A protein has these predicted regions:
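Sec/Tat signal peptide C-region and signal peptidase I cleavage site
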Residues: 18-22
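Bacterial N-terminal signal peptides
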Residues: 6-17
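Short, solvent-exposed loop/turn segments at secondary-structure junctions
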Residues: 41-42, 90, 116-117, 199-201, ...
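Extracellular ligand-binding/catalytic regions of CAZymes and related secreted enzymes
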Residues: 24-31, 64, 201-204, 211-258
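Catalytic beta-strand/loop cores that center a nucleophilic Ser/Cys/Thr
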Residues: 50, 57-59, 146-216
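A glycine-rich, often tryptophan-bearing local segment used as a flexible ligand/cofactor-contacting loop or short
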Residues: 89-167
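Positively charged n-region of N-terminal signal peptides that target proteins for export
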Residues: 1-4
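Helical hinge/lid and interdomain linker segments adjacent to catalytic or ligand-binding clefts
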Residues: 27, 31-37, 43-119
Length: 258
């Protein structure tokens, strides 16, 4: 009887492992539906948004923040698979509450660059994206962080994989990108770092994943302007992150950045 129970337990563990792998990289089920948020930063939104029209198996809608923030509420997960956020916008407490409830329900979230500055005054946001820009020395969970310092906007940043087995980083070549370099921000200790840098003027954790309720979260520090956006490696990472956040297979046969 004991041997039988042990065998059943082993089978259950094996099945759970298979289920986890399938959930990690599920086969395609139609196009990935993406909602892209922009606004508040002053960059050329059309250049950034145009990238999504060139990505295979993806359809996107662009909305302006904070004007259309009320769209981010429970029920949106039935219309979209992933939200890609590139805005820097302050939203109301009511809108933040609805947005938090949506994320808890489960929708993929890809947060890029200055989006960590969004939702000013909503402390929960740092728990969602796993990081925070500290305008001044800030105490978080008993430790002091900041102030965040900018070294430049077109600094050569060398990026390497921190976890070569993660779907977003697997088979991704090292690359260098000219981008905004900043450091001394807050990064939560429990995020899973996917990409890193040893560029001393830059935050070492370049990109990482987290979980917020049922929401898969990916945040990347890169992407200040067109010079970064036009780097093939940036497009590759963004494409992989969207697929991962949607629970889809990450096609590693697609562009591998030089």
């Amino acid at each position: 009887m004991k041997h039988g129970c042990a065998a059943l337990l082993g089978l259950a563990v094996a099945l759970a492992s298979v289920a986890w792998v399938q959930a990690e990289e599920a086969p395609a089920k139609g196009k990935i539906r993406v909602l892209v948020t922009v606004g508040g930063h002053g960059f050329d939104e059309n250049v950034f948004a145009a990238k999504f029209g060139k990505m295979p198996d993806l359809e996107y809608t662009k909305i302006q923040m904070p004007q259309q923030a009320k769209m981010l509420k429970p029920g949106l997960e039935k219309e979209y698979d992933v939200i890609v956020m590139f805005d820097w916008a302050k939203t109301s407490a009511e809108d933040n509450k609805s947005f938090g409830e949506l994320l808890q329900r489960g929708i993929g979230l890809v947060s890029m660059h200055a989006n960590l500055l969004s939702h000013e005054g909503w402390d929960e946001w740092r728990k969602v994206v796993g990081c925070k820009w500290c305008f001044k020395e800030t105490e978080i969970d008993g430790k002091k962080h900041g102030p965040t310092q900018i070294a430049g906007y077109t600094v050569p940043i060398k990026v390497t994989a921190a976890d070569k087995e993660h779907p977003i980083a697997r088979d991704l070549a090292d690359f260098t990108i000219a981008d905004e370099a900043f450091r001394n921000g807050y990064v939560a200790p429990d995020v899973h770092v996917v990409l890193k840098t040893d560029t001393t003027t830059c935050q070492p954790q370049v990109a990482f994943t987290a979980q917020y309720g049922k929401c898969r979260v990916f945040h990347c520090m890169l992407g200040h302007g067109a010079e970064a956006w036009n780097n093939p490696a940036f497009t590759d990472v963004l494409d992989r992150a969207i697929r991962w956040a949607a629970g889809r297979a990450v096609d590693r046969a697609v562009r591998n950045s030089p």
